[in-house]
Amino acid sequence: MAKSKFERTKPHVNIGTIGHVDHGKTSLTAAITKFFGEFKAYDQIDAAPEERARGITISTAHVEYETPNRHYAHVDCPGHADYVKNMITGAAQMDGAILVVSAADGPMPQTREHILLARQVGVPAIVVFLNKCDQVDDAELLELVELEVRELLSKYDFPGDEVPIIKGSALAALEDSSKELGEDAVRSLMAAVDDYIPTPERPIDQPFLMPIEDVFSISGRGTVVTGRVERGIVKVGEEVEIVGIKATAKTTVTGVEMFRKLLDQGQAGDNIGALIRGVGREDVERGQVLCKPGSVKPHTKFKAEAYILTKDEGGRHTPFFTNYRPQFYFRTTDVTGVVTLPEGTEMVMPGDNVAMDVTLIVPIAMEEKLRFAIREGGRTVGAGIVSSIIE
C-alpha cells in the first residue's frame, strides 16, 4: 500500500504530558489516542525508544493524533530524568504542555519541578488534567487540590487563575467505566488544549537568522557564507547583520545559492550559500550569525538552566564548583565561559540539573530559549538553555 501523503491542512502543534511519577501521564496519553488518533496501549507508549539529542540519550515516546482543528505531535517520557533532559535539550519541542496531577495525591515534588522547568525553558502554556478523580469522593478535597495546583502555577509565573483544569480519570477512559470521568473528560481536555494553547508561529514567519557554518572567498565575486537557515526568509538585495564574536557589521546579500543553483531567496530549513557585499573573508567566522538587522543582539552574560551528564552518559566523573570554565557550544561553535552557581549551591554533581549564571569570554548572538551544549575538549558534559539574558 502506498504511504499516505502527510496532509498539511491543519495547523501543527507539539505538545507533551508532564507531572509527577505515577500520576497517570502515560495512561492519559493512551486515552487521548483512543479518541483522537490511532489507539496506542499503555505498554506501547511506556516502552519508549531511546534517542540522542545533543550527545545525550533520552527515552521518549511519540504519538500523534488530531482534533477537528489541529494536528498534534505528543511526547511522553517514561522517567523523571528523561523529562529533565528532554525539556532542557529541546529534543522534543513543546508548544504547550498537559500537566497531569493525581487528585488523590495533589501536587508532588516532580509536579513542582516540571512546572519550574516549563517556565525555565519557555513552554508557552499549560493545561491541567486532574486525574484519578474516581478515587476521590469528597468534592471539597477536589477543590482544594485544584486550588493548590493554581497556586503552584502562579508561583512560577503561569496565569494560575486562568489555566483550564479538567477533572477526570484516564483509567475510566481506557476501561469505559465512566463516560463522564472518562471519554467526556478527555474530550473536554482536548477542547481546552485546542482553545488555550496558542498556535506557534512558524519558523518561516519569524525574522531571518542563519548560523554561519563556513566562509569561502570566490574570486571575482566576493565572500560567501554557508549554513542552514534557522528561521525566516532572506531575499537577494536585502540588508542583513553579522552578529556575534566581533562588533556587529551590516552587509547586503547579493546572491543566494542552493545545490549550486542561484535562487532569489533562501528560507527556513534551506542549506544555502549567501554572497555578501563588501565583507572580507577574514571579517566573518563560523559561530557568528547572519540575521535581519536589529533582530538579535550579541551578549556575554546570561542565566541558564542546565543538565549535567552522569559518568555513565559519558559526562564528568567529578562535581564542579563556581568558576568552572568549560566551553559552551552555541549553534556552530564553542566559546569558553565562566560558571557562577546560585547561592546555597556549593557544587554540581554529574546527573544534576542546575540554574546557573554564565559569563562568556566573547559575545554570541543570543536570545532567551537558545539551547547550548556544555563541552570539555570536544566532549559533551551537559546541555542547557538560556533562561534569561543579563547583559
From Swiss-Prot:
Matching SUPFAM superfamilies: EF-Tu/eEF-1alpha/eIF2-gamma C-terminal domain, P-loop containing nucleoside triphosphate hydrolases, Translation proteins
Name the reaction it catalyses.
GTP + H2O = GDP + phosphate + H(+)
HAMAP family linked: EF_Tu_B
Read off the Gene3D superfamilies from this record.
P-loop containing nucleotide triphosphate hydrolases, Translation factors
The protein here is known as: Elongation factor Tu
The record's similarity note reads: Belongs to the TRAFAC class translation factor GTPase superfamily. Classic translation factor GTPase family. EF-Tu/EF-1A subfamily.
Gene Ontology MF, one: guanosine tetraphosphate binding
Annotated GO CC locations = cytosol
Q: Region entry G4: which residue ranges? A: 131-134
Please list where the region (G3) is annotated.
76-79
Root EC class: hydrolase
**Job description of the protein:** GTP hydrolase that promotes the GTP-dependent binding of aminoacyl-tRNA to the A-site of ribosomes during protein biosynthesis.
UniProt-annotated binding residues for Mg(2+): T26
> One Pfam family, short name please?
GTP_EFTU_D2
Question: Which positions are annotated as binding GTP?
Answer: 19-26, 76-80, 131-134
Q: Which organism is it from?
A: Brucella anthropi (strain ATCC 49188 / DSM 6882 / CCUG 24695 / JCM 21032 / LMG 3331 / NBRC 15819 / NCTC 12168 / Alc 37)
Its subcellular locations are: Cytoplasm
Quaternary organization = Monomer.
* Enzyme Commission number(s) of this protein: 3.6.5.3
**Positions of region (G5):** 169-171
Chain intervals for the UniProt region annotation (G1) = 19-26
Indicate the segments forming the tr-type G domain, all copies.
Answer: 10-201
Output the PANTHER family linked to this UniProt entry. ELONGATION FACTOR TU, MITOCHONDRIAL, ELONGATION FACTOR TU-RELATED
| Segments for region (G2) | 55-59
Which InterPro entries does the record cross-reference, listed alphabetically? EF-Tu_GTP-bd (IPR041709), EF-Tu_GTPase (IPR050055), EFTu-like_2 (IPR004161), EFTU_2 (IPR033720), G_TR_CS (IPR031157), P-loop_NTPase (IPR027417), Small_GTP-bd (IPR005225), T_Tr_GTP-bd_dom (IPR000795)
Cross-referenced CDD domains: EF_Tu, EFTU_II, EFTU_III
Q: Which UniProt keywords apply?
A: Cytoplasm, Elongation factor, GTP-binding, Hydrolase, Magnesium, Metal-binding, Nucleotide-binding, Protein biosynthesis
